[in-house]
Curated annotation (Swiss-Prot):
EC number: 4.2.3.3
The name this protein goes by in its record: Methylglyoxal synthase
Gene expressing this chain: mgsA
Pfam families found in the cross-reference section: MGS
Active-site feature positions: D71 (proton donor/acceptor)
One GO process term, biological-process aspect: methylglyoxal biosynthetic process
Gene Ontology terms for molecular function: methylglyoxal synthase activity
Lineage of the organism: Bacteria, Pseudomonadati, Pseudomonadota, Gammaproteobacteria, Pasteurellales
Organism name: Mannheimia succiniciproducens (strain KCTC 0769BP / MBEL55E)
Binding-site residues for substrate, renumbered to this chain: H19, K23, T45, G46, T47, T48, S65, G66, H98
Amino acid sequence: METTFRHVAAQKHIALVAHDHCKEDLINWCQKNVHHLQNHQLYATGTTGHLIEKATELKINSLLSGPMGGDQQLGALIAENKIDVMIFFWDPMNAVPHDPDVKALLRIAAVWNIPHAMNIASADLLINSPLINREIELRIPDYQTYLQKRLK
């Protein structure tokens, strides 16, 4: 597939997601990094968003709970280029009923080339990168060219 670039502003749109067994880790991570996160627009799936907001007083745009469609909503925002970074603490040792949604979310994050961290170590590296507060260009699929070729 051909690619193009999209401009990402210095203020990022960051998605915060965590499975039940990982919510406490994400909340603690957010508390530790509140000084970084407060400079960005934050989104989260339902329960996670409310818990983070309560623990940190950060403003969170909460979507539906993951199993109720929040993962799908987040995937749609990624495909619409409305999410720039995703922090997703998931539990590789426990299957969840909405596992296909989780896999779809991870896939769409990879397709649209958004930086995403799936554990504390990678989240720390990502949030502490000098690029997190800078304008950047991301290489993404050129959907218009793809569509034009398919419609010929």
